[in-house]
């Protein structure tokens, strides 16, 4: 038998919708498309972040009533499953098991729908469960934090933390739709509101000078939760993250670089080192400053741009250093762990100016150590 070779062309549609309120944000339209045909009506399991319910105790009932009102035009909704939010959702194996048991109890099949409403961690673990159950159940994401709406929900990755490592287990799976109800952001504390804008700064620094200048100019308004200022930043950041997935040529990260993880090797390690005392966005903010300093020391970025980046993050109420980072040896282990995750001669993204970057830099560890020392001195 001769060798058999063929290319597989796989087609996915990656839908992002923004609005205010469940209907305006596009939830109804998305679910009607997923109803099922030929006399078959799919079922739907809503999964809701408990953190949202702390601020809006009525939301689970509101969602259930809204889904029921769609009637036969949409999948048949089960009672919501409530999960704890934050990184515990990804750290605790019992939470993943709880989701899988509920999927099994509700007789969820590959034509069913999981609707996950929550922050990035809940989106991750619910998405992972959906991806591995029956080898893939259709997923609709409804992100409820600034970080999830301007970044995390736009990607096609899911995952959980195991063996003390961030996202050690995970999948790539394109959601059926991402529905961003901007009104849900009103439930956030100031700390978690601010935290999400670190990812907007990240994408602006490496991809979009105009967005960076908008954030720099409007930082006080964004921090004070001015709707127009914040929404403009969130929407543009989301679009840039989405465009990287659909136009960047490597949605499933088969290459040797992850430009959207600028600042993240340090961030992931700091989250672990502080036992998640730092939020993801706060850790990313510190990582951005560290890697911008590395870029300066390598002659890639000018000092003024580095200072503007750090100043903008601070103006958004985000940290630019943490005492945990004084343990340089432990923090630098995160760089090696980051490289191991990709495998091969992988590099990191470093800015060359505001709005531009190299995606595959390989700084010497002594340069990175020097950058950490400088950041510590300036803190």
Task: Specify the residue positions occupied by each region the protein language model found.
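A glycine/threonine-rich phosphate-anchoring loop and its flanking beta-alpha core
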Residues: 17, 127-221
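Short hydrophobic segments within beta-strands
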Residues: 47-49, 117, 142
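Glycine-rich beta-strand-to-loop/alpha-helix junction loops that act as flexible
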Residues: 84-86, 117-119, 249, 262-263
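Active-site and donor-binding regions of nucleotide-sugar-utilizing enzymes
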Residues: 106-140
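ATP/NTP phosphate-donor binding region
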Residues: 1-112
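Residue-level signal for inorganic ion chemistry
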Residues: 19, 46, 143, 181, ...
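C-terminal charged capping/lid subdomain of soluble metabolic enzymes
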Residues: 2-9, 48, 198-201, 300-379
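Active-site segments that bind and position negatively charged phosphate/pyrophosphate groups
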Residues: 214-329
């Amino acid at each position: 038998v001769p060798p058999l070779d063929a290319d597989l062309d796989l087609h996915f549609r990656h839908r992002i919708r923004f609005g205010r309120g469940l209907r305006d944000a596009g939830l109804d339209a998305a679910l009607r498309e997923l109803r099922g045909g030929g006399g078959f009506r799919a079922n739907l399991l809503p999964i809701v972040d408990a953190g949202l319910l702390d601020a809006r105790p009525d939301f689970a009932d509101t969602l259930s009533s809204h889904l029921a009102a769609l009637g036969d035009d949409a999948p048949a909704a089960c009672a919501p499953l409530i999960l704890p939010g934050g990184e515990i959702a990804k750290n605790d194996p019992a939470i993943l098991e709880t989701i899988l048991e509920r999927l099994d109890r509700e007789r969820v099949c590959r034509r069913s729908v999981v609707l996950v409403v929550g922050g990035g961690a809940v989106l991750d673990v619910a998405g992972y469960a959906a991806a591995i159950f029956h080898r893939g159940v259709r997923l609709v994401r409804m992100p409820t934090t600034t970080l999830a709406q301007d970044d995390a929900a736009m990607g096609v990755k899911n995952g959980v933390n195991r063996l003390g490592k961030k996202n050690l287990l995970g999948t790539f799976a394109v959601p059926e739709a991402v529905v961003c109800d901007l009104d849900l952001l009103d439930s956030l504390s100031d700390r978690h509101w601010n935290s999400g804008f670190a990812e907007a700064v990240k994408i602006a620094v490496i991809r979009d000078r105009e967005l960076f200048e908008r954030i720099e100019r409007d930082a006080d308004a964004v921090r004070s939760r001015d709707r127009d200022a914040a929404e403009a930043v969130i929407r543009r950041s989301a679009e840039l993250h989405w465009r990287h997935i659909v136009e960047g040529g490597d949605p499933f990260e088969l290459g040797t670089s992850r430009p959207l993880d600028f600042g993240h090797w340090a961030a992931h390690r700091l989250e672990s080192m502080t036992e998640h005392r730092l939020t993801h966005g706060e850790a990313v903010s510190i990582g951005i400053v560290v890697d911008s300093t590395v870029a300066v020391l390598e002659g890639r970025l000018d000092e003024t741009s580095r200072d503007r980046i750090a100043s903008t993050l601070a103006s958004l109420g985000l940290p630019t250093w943490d005492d945990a980072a004084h343990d340089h040896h432990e923090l630098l282990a995160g760089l090696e762990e980051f490289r191991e995750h990709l495998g091969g001669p992988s590099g990191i993204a470093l800015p060359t100016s505001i709005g531009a970057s190299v995606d595959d830099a390989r700084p010497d560890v002594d340069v990175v150590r020097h950058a950490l020392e400088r950041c510590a001195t300036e803190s």
